[in-house]
């Protein structure tokens, strides 16, 4: 099992990737969505709206799963995080949501009245995740250990992903 301080985990948590967040629907099925996030070294923050299914699901069940991966076949790596979520409101929410938005949107987008203020008003709460389990994987390491570097020495073995 990995930890939040592992270099690969920190690279993924501090980088600009799209995460997949899973929550439980009232009927027990899984609700999974793509999200932007911010990592402060201990918690993960996701800007969202009280109107979203994920926020409503977390009101009754705070357990989450989060996956962040590189989406690069030649250097596939990722982290799976299980944790407990808390919904932040008010000033703490505005602070964290601002950091999430600034991580993914350019200064020009944030200043554009059609973009920045819309995100700020739509995302009225923040999901704060306290990780309880962290598991990381690195296909480059698996290639060296299991496949004798077959993929590294033959880049055409892995087909490109759709964009």
Predicted regions mapped to residue ranges:
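Short, basic/aromatic recognition patches
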Residues: 1-20
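A generic local structural motif
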Residues: 5-8, 31-33, 51-53, 113-115
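Alpha-helix boundary recognition
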Residues: 13-14, 59-60, 120
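Residues that act as N-cap/strand-start positions at coil-to-secondary-structure junctions
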Residues: 15, 31, 121-123
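Short beta-strand segments
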Residues: 17-50, 56-58, 64-69, 77-80
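A short beta-turn/loop motif at secondary-structure boundaries
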Residues: 27-29, 72-74, 117-121
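Short, surface-exposed beta-strand-loop junctions and turns on beta-sheet-rich folds
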Residues: 52-54, 73, 143-144
